A protein has these predicted regions:
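Short Lys/Arg-rich amphipathic alpha-helical segments
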Residues: 1-160
Length: 160
């Protein structure tokens, strides 16, 4: 089973057992993950989603068979995952989740590795790559990120 990290349960909300999850996933991916009747994994146990909504920066989730705040208190501060069989990832989404597994190929055919994918604010991201033992920062946009091949786990980039 291949698990994808979704976020962390930070607190409860209300008395009906709703839990707050803080997650760094893109909204398009959250829409795939938090579908009603999907199952999420907490401590390697599956829980079925009864409802989902956004509230401020949180993902608010009700789980089946939990109708009271006291029933969900044991889940506090736990990490939430989803089995990858429940969602179909695009190449871009796969890269954002599994960037450390990707090999970098530059436009002049040099090879390297992705060290990090960092947010710099205002929804802007930078890819930190290492090519020939030299660290480079590459803007995460279509001008520099030429091709993502999720089957080969390769990303083709343009360096300046």
């Amino acid at each position: 089973m291949d698990k994808i990290y979704v976020g962390t349960i930070v607190s409860t909300h209300g008395i009906k057992g709703e839990i707050r999850i803080i997650s760094k996933l893109e909204q398009s991916l959250k829409e795939k993950v938090f579908k009603v009747d999907n199952s999420i994994l907490i401590n390697d146990k599956e829980y079925k989603l009864k409802s989902y909504r956004r509230h401020k920066n949180y993902d608010m989730v009700l789980l089946d068979d939990f109708n009271n705040i006291n029933d969900v208190l044991f889940l506090m501060k736990q990490k939430v995952y989803i089995d990858s069989k429940y969602i179909e990832l695009s190449a871009k989404e796969d890269f954002e989740l599994n960037y450390k597994e990707y090999e970098v190929i530059t436009s002049d055919k040099q090879k390297g590795v992705v060290k990090a994918l960092e947010e710099t604010g205002n929804n802007y991201k930078i890819i930190r790559v290492v090519v020939n033992n030299k660290e480079e920062l590459v803007p995460y946009n279509e001008h520099f990120l030429k091709k993502i091949d999720s089957s080969k786990k390769q990303v083709e980039i343009e360096l300046l």
